[in-house]
Design a protein with these regions (language model features):
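Conserved helix-turn-beta segment of the N-terminal RecA-like "Helicase ATP-binding" lobe
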Residues: 22-48, 146-152, 225-228
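Conserved ATPase-coupling elements of RecA-like P-loop NTPase cores
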Residues: 26-27, 55, 76-81, 98-113, ...
């Protein structure tokens, strides 16, 4: 994307994320990247339900890179595509993050939305390249074809430099005092492991399936760190959907 901007200042990119939290996070990261490489003068912003009206107009008319979600493409861009003609006519790249999310009914809706988007782009003389990303999918080529009706080239090898990595599958221990088949709570194991790792200076991220579970693990980790490494307790923070920017 940076190469596209460097080659052509008029190019446009649309980055699509399934959640507002992820969209905001990637927007902040991209801004830091632009600053690091010295690319200035480009209007980059988030276009979602919380975006003020004046910023929406500026992004529509002058935006180079827009971070958004499927709902906003459907409700704002497609229903008023005439107002977006300048952006859509210069659209060179569409990025679909977390591709695996789009399955079932959501996937069907997304497939139809993308077909509408690309049809409107053709109407304005644009043929954007599509880039999709996912770390948890077994059939990326098949899903990409179903969603976009276009063939793709799968890049499934990470060529970036990295240090040694160890993968451990952790099974909570059995509780002998009760039923032999019972095991300790995975959430309890998770917060104890996280606290021990942080106390030993290991940067740690813990994922959970629900927002409430994330908050619960966060509280337990902080409580544990106050016992074993008080200086680290203030360095832990939860991050989930539902927070305001």
């Amino acid at each position: 994307m940076l190469e596209l901007l460097q080659r052509d200042a008029e190019t446009r990119a649309l980055l699509v994320f399934p959640t507002k939290a992820l969209c905001q996070d990637q927007f902040q990261s991209f801004n830091r990247l632009l600053s690091a490489v010295g690319l200035t003068g480009y209007l980059v912003g988030v276009f979602d339900g919380d975006t003020p009206a004046d910023l929406r107009r500026r992004l529509r008319d002058k935006g180079s890179v827009i971070f958004t979600n499927p709902d906003m493409i459907h409700a704002a861009m497609m229903t008023q595509h005439g107002r977006w003609s300048e952006f859509l006519s210069c659209l060179s790249l569409v990025v679909l993050d977390e591709l695996h999310v789009y399955s079932g009914i959501l996937g069907s809706n997304m497939a139809l939305l993308l077909r509408r988007l690309f049809r409107v782009c053709r109407h304005y003389g644009a043929a954007p390249q599509i880039m999709a990303l996912s770390a948890t999918i077994a059939n990326p080529e098949e899903l990409f074809l179903k969603l976009t009706a276009r063939p793709c080239v799968v890049v499934d090898r990470d060529g970036s430099p990295r240090g040694k990595r160890t993968t451990v599958l952790w099974n909570p221990p059995r509780i002998r005092q009760t039923n032999w088949r019972s095991r300790r709570s995975a959430n309890v194991e998770a917060h104890e492991l996280m606290a021990r790792l942080i106390a030993n200076g290991v940067p740690t991220i813990t994922f959970s399936k629900a927002k409430m579970t994330a908050e619960m693990i966060y509280r337990y980790v902080c409580d544990k760190l106050r016992e074993i490494a008080p200086q680290q307790a203030s360095k832990v923070t939860p991050y989930r959907g539902g927070y305001r920017p």
